[in-house]
């Protein structure tokens, strides 16, 4: 539970929750969210899907279905809210909007936890009460009434001392810490129990949020639902038949001790770690340094006629032209290993990996012939392939580690910040490092040009970050990321055979050239440490496996074509997908342990969890017709059993063939299934966290283009950032964590939904602020109370709408309606909330204050429109207002989204903004007039009556107009940022006032449309506006007693002007600075005691 905001008085929240519960029940009874395709009776099966969509508009969105090893938390809810808001909005656009949600159970976490509990029950009894003595300090927490956390990922809140004592050591202890009663825990030793326990909780939690989910279409994955099981078998068979699933050698995390692949469930640490591919660069030793030569010469086991290669692991083969030396660690013990026709010099750990990758004479043999301390190699003369320098030296680098790569690092100071700063350090202190200056004194060779950092990326970034030493580890890590990203995405080769090509294109070509020339080879190791449960430090081995051939060229082209046609909502998302599509290769499709579907042609394997979750959205379209419960136990309305769902039947549904020869399913039933699919597909948008781009979402694209006709390829993907809670990372261990259930219990559904909408819409991390949720409770409750009271109010005005503030309020409502619509359409829910609630309510507040007595028709429209604008985000509140306050007989869920009642008059809105700014200026001027200056009294005596005078300029000063023209000219020539050119157009005597004004114009151009900046003529009559709102202007002052109010209109620079109320010519008050600053749209404000 979050240790954040504590709610003192919950009466308002409880009143809103009562409304929410009431309408959730009504919506369920009305089957509001059960959305069907047009029936075959309505439209014949022969109607093309595109025509069907034109006649009956639809929208389908989904999120990555949650994993059933716990309940949903606020982070899940943030993703869910994006689907929710889009579904709510599209319903109001007249579309059949479908939001289905399933329950993912595939994989190892559930079974691994269940098996742990089985073992612990054997050790400690079914009640887990025979714990060894040293564990008896474990205390059972008082069970919470409902507190179902993700029990496979819990981090107990314990001190270091408690941790050392073993608290949380066993799975049953984690369950106890979560508040699950001891006597209930044994049930979780059966993996099936998890599948019955968590899905109903997920449904009830989502329902409590008011989610518009069609629960008829929900299901669990794995063979626990035989229909979904048949669907995944069909998917696997189709992919295999299409040549997308293959069998062969694949780089795999492997435990030598266990003699088998080490999958996630077998790991003590390193879950999710995959093989990292490097290029092993063979750097030939030409002449060993004396100390190394003595050791090598003294060994009779070495064949001196063979070549010796230092093997450097690199991710950047395209930079090899710029090698200036090669680094080893003076403190690492290196081995000289038999590599067949040559010797490799590397760490034993690296050669162990190589020995399982067909890179050595004998699999699994990695004993060194000779070991040599790294410092003995310093000064060794070498030849680095592709380098512009034929001879280089081995030099020391203290930051090289033995647990990453090969312990040998090739030096490219042009593009590696680490190499650049180390080279610089060696040059400054050669005596300290025991090297000769000429060994390091090589000119840095520019290899590629980048847009931001020029030809020497590393040097530029090191200087930008002010990195002083190789010991600046954090800065160097940051610099390395920047350098790699800039080089890869913006770099162009300026050296070598691929000069002029983009780095991302040249990279693989250089790699292929080096491998073909025998200068390098592909080498893999775990991307970070993986420890097996047996305590083995795992390696990477080439193993025979079934795998999906992602990255295959023709398939990849299809995936790219699909991506190009998608709406992705943010350029960063497209960049991320393009990066993944560039590197993603084959992926193991199966495992031997866990829950899931058996591989149809090799049933000792299970389809792994990322492979059975790629096209489940298509299964949503037909699920409700096949079964009535999550598990497929109860046959659905079409009377089709799971064993009738053959591959041939799925082929018909998903339009791979037009008839089914071998089935006893009636044709009308088959047609109904096909109709549901062809109506709701393609999926309009899939919404997930951005962390799923490298796997789940990319697999989603690949599998869709492989299995469905082009017209059914997905139309959009939205990736959101992670959710923070109160500006801190969500974490169970710190207590800064909330489940979906807790969020709704604490704030109610609508207030929570408003806080989720306000959290953010970009791919950057968002923030759920509890204070915003709490403020939403007060805002909604007060709005509800006001709406109830005002609709009973008998003193509201009626008749024609002619008053300025009536007209302005109507136009402002219309403008905000259109802005809100636009932001919903763009899926910018934070902005939709701003315009549709905060600004809309502020418009009402200003109207209420300005008008004196409000107009009944406008207030009725405001209340209805407010309910409709909020309906996608806060549907319970909207429903209450729509039905109970306004008396509508139908649901707001079926209402149309409001649109402007008439074209928006921009002049009226400009006049309204003018008045607001004028009132603000009067209050600010009042504050200045009352402020006591040093050694003097205030300009105005607040105890005496005051005259307020507005000085309304009819024209702009000539010098400003000239500045505007200068800016317009330079802006069109794209030279406005050149201050020298700006100054050339300004007379010296005008410089002092012109430059700040031009700076202001430049700032406006950065945030506004150019035409709005350059067009200075007002869209309204300033004089008419002041006359119409004279009473309001006079009341703007708060501390002063305004006894008289006048307004003088005058041409800029004149000494006299016209009183706009009497028409008399009058003198302008002698307030030089105020008069000079007055321009059209920004009058001067003068206070005088009378």
UniProtKB/Swiss-Prot annotation:
Motif segment ('HIGH' region): 66-76
Coiled coil: none
EC number: 6.1.1.4
Pfam families per record: Anticodon_1, RBD_LARS1, tRNA-synt_1
Sequence motif: 'KMSKS' region, positions: 729-733
SUPFAM superfamilies attached to this UniProt entry: Anticodon-binding domain of a subclass of class I aminoacyl-tRNA synthetases, Nucleotidylyl transferase, ValRS/IleRS/LeuRS editing domain
GO cellular component: cytoplasm
A single GO molecular function term of this UniProt record: aminoacyl-tRNA deacylase activity
Superkingdom of the organism of origin: Eukaryota
GO terms under biological process: leucyl-tRNA aminoacylation; regulation of TORC1 signaling
Chemical reaction(s) catalysed: tRNA(Leu) + L-leucine + ATP = L-leucyl-tRNA(Leu) + AMP + diphosphate
CDD domains in the record: Anticodon_Ia_Leu_AEc, LeuRS_core
Subcellular location: Cytoplasm
Sites of N-acetylserine modification: 2
Residues modified as Phosphothreonine: 142
Keywords (A to Z) from UniProt: Acetylation, Aminoacyl-tRNA synthetase, ATP-binding, Cytoplasm, Ligase, Nucleotide-binding, Phosphoprotein, Protein biosynthesis
Binding site residues for ATP: 732
NCBIfam families: leuS_arch (TIGR00395), PRK12300.1 (NF008957)
Family note: Belongs to the class-I aminoacyl-tRNA synthetase family.
Additional observations: Present with 158000 molecules/cell in log phase SD medium.
The protein, known as: Leucine--tRNA ligase, cytoplasmic
Gene responsible for this protein: CDC60
């Amino acid at each position: 539970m979050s240790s954040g905001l504590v709610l003192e008085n919950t009466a308002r929240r409880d009143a809103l929750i009562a409304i929410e519960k009431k309408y959730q029940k009504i919506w369920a009874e009305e089957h509001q969210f059960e959305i069907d395709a047009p029936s075959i009776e309505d439209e014949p099966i022969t109607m093309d899907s595109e025509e069907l969509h034109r006649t009956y508009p639809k929208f389908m969105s989904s999120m990555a279905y949650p994993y059933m090893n716990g309940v949903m938390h606020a982070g899940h809810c943030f993703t869910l809210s994006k689907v929710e808001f889009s579904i709510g909005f599209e319903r109001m656009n007249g579309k059949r909007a479908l939001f289905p949600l399933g329950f993912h159970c595939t994989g190892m976490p559930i079974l691994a936890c269940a098996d742990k509990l089985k073992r612990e029950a054997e050790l400690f009894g079914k009640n887990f009460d025979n714990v060894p003595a040293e564990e008896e300090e474990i205390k059972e927490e008082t069970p919470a009434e409902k507190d179902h956390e993700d029990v496979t990922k819990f981090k107990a809140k314990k001190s270091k001392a408690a941790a050392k004592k073993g608290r949380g050591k066993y799975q049953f202890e984690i369950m106890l810490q979560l508040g699950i009663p001891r006597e209930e825990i044994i049930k979780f030793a059966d993996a099936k129990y998890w599948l019955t326990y968590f899905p109903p909780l997920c449904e009830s939690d989502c329902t409590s949020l008011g989610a518009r989910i069609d629960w008829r279409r929900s299901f669990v994955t794995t063979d626990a639902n035989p229909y979904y099981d048949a669907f995944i078998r069909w998917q696997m068979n189709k992919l295999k038949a299409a040549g997308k699933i293959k069998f062969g050698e694949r780089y795999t995390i492997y435990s030598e001790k266990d003699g088998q692949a080490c999958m996630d469930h077998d790991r003590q640490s390193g879950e999710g770690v995959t093989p990292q591919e490097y290029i092993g660069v063979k750097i030939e030793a030409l002449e060993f340094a004396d100390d190394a030569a003595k050791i090598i010469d003294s060994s009779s086991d070495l064949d001196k006629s063979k070549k010796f290669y230092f093997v450097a692991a690199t991710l950047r083969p395209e930079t090899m032209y710029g090698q200036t030396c090669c680094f080893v660690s003076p403190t690492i013990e290196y081995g000289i290993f038999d590599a067949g026709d040559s010797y490799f010099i590397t760490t034993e750990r690296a050669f162990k990996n190589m020995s399982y990758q067909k890179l050595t004479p004998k699999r699994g043999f990695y004993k060194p012939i000779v070991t040599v301390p790294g410092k003995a190699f310093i000064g060794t003369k070498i030849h680095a392939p592709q380098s512009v320098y034929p001879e280089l030296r081995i030099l020391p680098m203290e930051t090289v580690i033995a647990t990453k790569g090969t312990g040998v690092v090739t030096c490219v100071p042009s593009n590696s910040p680490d190499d650049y700063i180390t080279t610089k350090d060696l040059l400054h202190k050669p005596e300290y490092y025991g090297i000769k200056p000429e060994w390091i004194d090589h000119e840095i060779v520019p290899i590629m040009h980048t847009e931001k950092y020029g030809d020497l990326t590393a040097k530029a970034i090191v200087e930008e970050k002010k990195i002083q030493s190789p010991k600046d580890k954090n800065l160097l890590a940051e610099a390395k990321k920047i350098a790699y990203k800039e080089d890869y995405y913006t770099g162009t080769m300026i050296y070598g055979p691929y000069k002029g090509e983009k780095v991302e294109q040249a990279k693989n070509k250089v790699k292929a050239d080096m491998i073909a020339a025998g200068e390098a080879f592909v080498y893999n190791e775990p991307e970070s440490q993986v420890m097996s449960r047996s305590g083995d430090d795992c390696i990477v081995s080439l193993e025979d496996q079934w795998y999906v051939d992602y990255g295959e060229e023709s398939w990849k082209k299809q995936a790219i074509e699909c991506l190009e046609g998608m709406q992705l909502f943010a350029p960063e998302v497209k960049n991320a997908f393009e990066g993944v599509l560039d590197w993603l290769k084959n992926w193991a499709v199966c495992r031997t342990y866990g829950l899931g579907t058996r591989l149809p042609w090799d049933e000792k394997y299970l389809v792994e969890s990322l492979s059975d979750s790629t096209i489940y959205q298509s299964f949503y379209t037909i699920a409700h017709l096949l079964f009535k419960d999550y598990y497929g136990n109860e046959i659905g309305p079409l009377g089709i059993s799971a064993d009738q769902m053959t591959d041939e039947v799925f082929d018909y549904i998903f339009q791979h063939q037009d008839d089914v020869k071998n089935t006893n399913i009636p044709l009308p039933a088959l047609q109904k299934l096909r109709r549901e699919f062809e109506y709701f597909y393609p999926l309009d948008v899939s919404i997930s966290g951005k962390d799923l781009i490298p796997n789940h979402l990319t697999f989603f694209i690949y599998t869709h283009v492989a299995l469905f006709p082009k017209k059914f390829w997905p139309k959009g993907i939205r990736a959101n950032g992670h959710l923070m809670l109160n500006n801190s990372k969500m974490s169970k261990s710190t207590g800064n964590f909330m489940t979906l259930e807790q969020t709704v219990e604490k704030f109610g559904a609508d207030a929570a939904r408003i806080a989720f909408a306000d959290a953010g819409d970009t791919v950057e991390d968002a923030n759920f602020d509890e204070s915003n949720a709490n403020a939403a409770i007060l805002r909604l409750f007060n709005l509800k109370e006001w709406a109830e009271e005002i609709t009973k109010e008998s003193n509201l005005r009626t008749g024609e709408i002619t008053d300025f503030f009536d007209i302005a309020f109507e136009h402002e409502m219309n403008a905000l309606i259109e802005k809100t619509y636009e932001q919903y359409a763009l899926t910018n829910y934070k902005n939709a909330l701003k315009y549709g609630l905060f600004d809309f309510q502020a418009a009402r507040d200003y109207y209420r204050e300005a008008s004196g007595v409000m107009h009944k028709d406008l207030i009725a429209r405001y209340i209805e429109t407010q309910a409709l604008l909020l309906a996608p985000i806060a549907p319970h509140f909207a429903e209450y207002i729509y039905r109970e306050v306004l008396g509508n007989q139908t649901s707001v869920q079926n209402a149309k989204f409001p649109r402007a009642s008439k074209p928006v008059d921009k002049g009226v809105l400009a006049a309204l903004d003018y008045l607001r700014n004028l009132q603000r200026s009067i209050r600010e001027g009042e504050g200045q007039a009352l402020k006591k200056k040093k050694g003097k009294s205030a300009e105005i005596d607040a105890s005496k009556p005051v005259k307020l005078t507005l000085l309304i300029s009819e024209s702009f000063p000539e010098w400003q107009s000239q500045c505007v023209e200068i800016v317009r000219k330079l802006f069109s020539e794209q030279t406005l940022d050149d201050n020298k050119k700006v100054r050339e157009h300004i007379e010296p005597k005008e410089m002092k006032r012109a430059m700040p004004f031009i700076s202001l114009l430049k700032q406006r151009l950065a945030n506004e449309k150019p035409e709005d900046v350059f067009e200075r003529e007002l869209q309204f009559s300033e004089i008419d506006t002041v006359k119409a709102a004279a009473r309001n202007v006079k009341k703007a002052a708060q501390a002063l007693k305004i006894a008289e109010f006048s307004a003088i209109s005058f041409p800029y620079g004149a000494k006299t002007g016209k009183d706009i109320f009497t028409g008399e010519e009058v003198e302008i008050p002698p307030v030089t600075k105020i008069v000079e600053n007055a321009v059209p749209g920004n009058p001067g404000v003068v206070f005088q005691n009378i």
